[in-house]
UniProtKB/Swiss-Prot annotation:
Its main location: secreted. One of its GO terms (biological process) is innate immune response. It comes from Drosophila erecta. This is Protein Turandot E. Keywords: Immunity, Innate immunity, Secreted, Signal. Residues 1-38 form the signal peptide. It comes from the Eukaryota. A humoral factor that may play a role in stress tolerance. Pfam families: Turandot. InterPro entries: Turandot. It is found in: Secreted. Belongs to the Turandot family. GO terms for cellular component: extracellular space.
Length: 145
């Protein structure tokens, strides 16, 4: 009978070790995901400030804004799910980005087309994204306090 108890005890210990190992693994994964999320928060905040400083500042000239427009697109594509946009705003921005890329790919004498009607559309898009970025930052600041 004592051998039965030993086998049962060894099985219980093995199950307990597995449970402890799984718990430790889950704890480590939770910490990694949590720190990744906080890094993402810090990165989002830094990129938001950068976008606002370039595109939200009326003293920045249109050439600087045009030169940094790829940064704005990259920001939008990476963080669009965090920006509080209506379906219509998102659709308009997506369409404008497609038009912008098509225009950039269309070259005349080896030079991308510039300015024109699309630049006016992009100004509106920039205004919407900057407004949403600013309101998102303000909401996140309020939630911290």
């Amino acid at each position: 009978m004592s051998s039965n108890r030993t086998v049962h005890s060894d099985t219980s210990t093995l199950k307990m070790n597995s449970a402890v190992q799984i718990s430790c693994l889950l704890l480590v994964l939770g910490c990694l995901l949590g720190s990744g999320h906080s890094q993402s928060e810090a990165e989002f905040a830094a990129k938001s400030r950068e976008i606002s400083q370039i595109f939200g500042n009326p003293s920045v000239d249109k050439y600087t804004k045009a030169r940094n427009f790829p940064k704005l697109i990259a920001f939008y594509e990476k963080y669009s799910s965090r920006l509080h946009l209506t379906a219509q705003e998102k659709n308009n921005i997506d369409n404008s980005i497609k038009q912008y890329r098509a225009q950039q790919n269309h070259q005349v004498d080896g030079v991308s087309a510039q300015g024109g009607k699309l630049f006016d559309v992009l100004k509106k898009i920039i205004k919407v994204i900057v407004m949403v970025v600013d309101s998102t930052k303000a909401n996140e600041e309020r939630q911290k306090t």
